């Protein structure tokens, strides 16, 4: 188990007046009520399943079939990915892109093909130099004015730029250049290109959640004159099949959550199990990860309860035995806890015990030990924050950051996400993850810094809480906006680290790395315009509605 910190003495006396010391929490109830308790009483009929299988094989043949040129092949693969069905054809797509990578005739390609090729190859880990874009610059080093009229080319360059790594100045310039010109052009474009551009400016492909983006692209793709009817039909059926699976999972989780009765027992805590499921379905939506999705949703639900216990209700003197109990991970510790803490402590242990039982048949119990240790470290870092709040202690920014990165929970979620995966995950995966590799660090920075900016900008943090933005402003004598700009630069730098982590040879298989990429994507989607988890913003409501409530019309 992780080392204990709860025994560290506090230099500030503790008040015995619990009511005075108790933080004040005021979270809104769930907007979903019991809506997801019951799953629609329907299954995909045998005929539709058979059609799905037939279409799948047709699409597979199309992916590997020779095409007149690489542009057509790249565009088709891009559509397969954009419609959210590439998980069926991982090997075929990889093989085709490998061929395109080695048969390079990029000198003849226009801006559209050069950018599309760059993005798809980078997404799959191939080293493609950003120098391929130099031919679109003039002698002064600026992008040629002639490319500004090529809207589809600009759109692809814009999307490609989000795959940039450190030192690729031309792609930093490209984001600004393409954003400006696409914003100017969008009003004069015809549908569906206007919708593609408008949506891209709000959400890039690289940082969007694949299933959310697929739901949107389905509505756009069918209006593209040259769309592939077989691919479109397959993607629609597949979307509905996966949606039904997700609804069944969420119904099961909602029943578990309702039986815990935390809404009554712990009224101080956020009731966000539906939003938690949406978060985790962003980490992995594919059917083969059903078990992992259900386990990780329960973990994020319990982590949310633990967070609110530390942050929104418990006194510091109550948190010491609570942290001790989590560190010791023993149900016997329950007798040492205040009465209101007992249900959440028991539920926490039950979730991990169930996890152990579910993975035991494959001999994967060792994975759960890593997951427990990650949860223990999270609780320990919460206790440090609680001590700072009690003492009204203002740490230096670096001191704050060292503790704040673990409190965002992303290292814990990344490690726990591996528990429900298949044989691609090994003991080496967990050893690697436990050593805080760069890609997990990067997704954690994205989470922490986006959350910090959001909390300060939208005043989502209690006045007595220690704020990273306030720490930075005080230490460096800057305004709030200047602090936001610095934090956002850290986020952009972390995205470059994520992208770097996918370039071959990778430290771990792509499926392992995808968990950190998708965790970062969730933050970009949910937290760009406020805390979309706690306050259930437009992104969360819209995503949950389109992915879990509304099927695609066939």
Swiss-Prot record:
Motif (DDXXD motif): 307-311
UniProt keywords, alphabetically: Lyase, Magnesium, Metal-binding
EC assignment: 4.2.3.13
Binding sites annotated in the UniProt record for Mg(2+) 2: 307, 311
InterPro entries assigned to the protein according to its UniProt record, in alphabetical order: Isoprenoid_synthase_dom_sf (IPR008949), Terpene_cyclase_plant_C1 (IPR044814), Terpene_synth_N (IPR001906), Terpene_synth_N_sf (IPR036965), Terpene_synthase-like (IPR050148), Terpene_synthase_metal-bd (IPR005630), Terpenoid_cyclase/PrenylTrfase (IPR008930)
Keyword Aminoacyl-tRNA synthetase attached: no
Needed cofactors: Mg(2+)
Name this polypeptide is given: (+)-delta-cadinene synthase
Organism: Gossypium hirsutum
């Amino acid at each position: 188990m992780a080392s204990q910190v709860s025994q560290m003495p506090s230099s500030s006396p503790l008040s015995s007046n619990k009511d005075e010391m108790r933080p004040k929490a005021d979270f809104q109830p769930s907007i979903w009520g019991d809506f997801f308790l019951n799953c629609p009483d329907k299954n995909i009929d045998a005929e539709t399943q058979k059609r799905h299988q037939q279409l799948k094989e047709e699409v597979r043949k199309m992916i590997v079939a020779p095409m007149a040129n690489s542009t057509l092949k790249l565009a088709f693969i891009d559509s397969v990915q954009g419609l959210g069905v590439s998980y069926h054809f991982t090997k075929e797509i990889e093989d085709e892109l490998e061929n395109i990578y080695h048969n390079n005739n990029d000198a003849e390609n226009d801006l559209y093909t050069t950018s599309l090729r760059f993005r798809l190859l980078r997404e799959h880990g191939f080293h493609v130099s950003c120098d391929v874009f130099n031919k679109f610059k003039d002698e002064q080093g600026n992008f040629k004015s002639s490319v500004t009229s090529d809207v589809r080319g600009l759109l692809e360059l814009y999307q490609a730029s989000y795959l940039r790594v450190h030192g690729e100045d031309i792609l930093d310039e490209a984001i600004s250049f393409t954003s400006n010109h696409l914003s100017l052009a969008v009003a004069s474009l015809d549908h569906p290109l206007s919708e593609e551009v408008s949506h891209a400016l709000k959400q890039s492909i690289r940082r969007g959640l694949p299933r959310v983006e697929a739901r949107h692209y389905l509505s756009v793709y069918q209006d593209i004159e040259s769309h592939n009817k077989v691919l479109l039909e397959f993607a629609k059926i597949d979307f509905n099949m996966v949606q039904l699976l997700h609804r069944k999972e969420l119904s099961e989780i909602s029943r578990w959550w309702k039986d815990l009765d935390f809404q009554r027992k712990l009224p101080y805590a956020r009731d966000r199990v539906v939003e938690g499921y949406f978060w985790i379905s962003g980490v992995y939506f594919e059917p083969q990860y059903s078990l992992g999705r259900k386990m990780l949703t329960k973990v994020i639900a319990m982590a949310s309860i633990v967070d609110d216990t530390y942050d929104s209700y418990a006194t510091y003197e109550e948190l010491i035995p609570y942290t001790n109990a989590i560190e010791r991970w023993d149900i016997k510790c329950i007798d040492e806890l205040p009465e209101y803490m007992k249900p959440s402590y028991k539920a926490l242990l039950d979730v991990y015990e169930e996890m152990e039982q579910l993975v035991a048949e494959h001999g994967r119990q060792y994975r759960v030990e890593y997951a427990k240790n990650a949860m223990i470290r999270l609780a320990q870092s919460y206790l440090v924050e609680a001590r700072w709040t009690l003492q009204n202690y203002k740490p230096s920014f670096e001191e704050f950051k060292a503790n704040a990165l673990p409190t965002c929970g992303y290292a814990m979620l990344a490690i726990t996400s591996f528990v429900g995966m298949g044989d691609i995950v090994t003991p080496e995966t967990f050893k690697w993850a436990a050593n805080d590799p760069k890609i997990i660090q990067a997704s954690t920075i994205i989470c922490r810094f986006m959350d910090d900016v959001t909390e300060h900008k939208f005043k989502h943090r209690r006045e007595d809480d220690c704020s990273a933005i306030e720490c930075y402003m005080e230490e460096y004598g800057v305004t709030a906006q200047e602090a936001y700009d610095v934090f956002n630069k850290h986020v952009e730098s972390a995205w470059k680290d994520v992208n770097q982590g996918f370039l071959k040879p990778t430290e771990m298989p792509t499926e392992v790395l995808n968990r950190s990429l998708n965790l970062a994507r969730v933050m970009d989607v949910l937290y760009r315009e406020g805390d979309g988890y706690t306050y259930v913003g437009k992104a969360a409501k819209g995503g949950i509605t389109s992915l879990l409530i509304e099927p695609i019309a066939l």
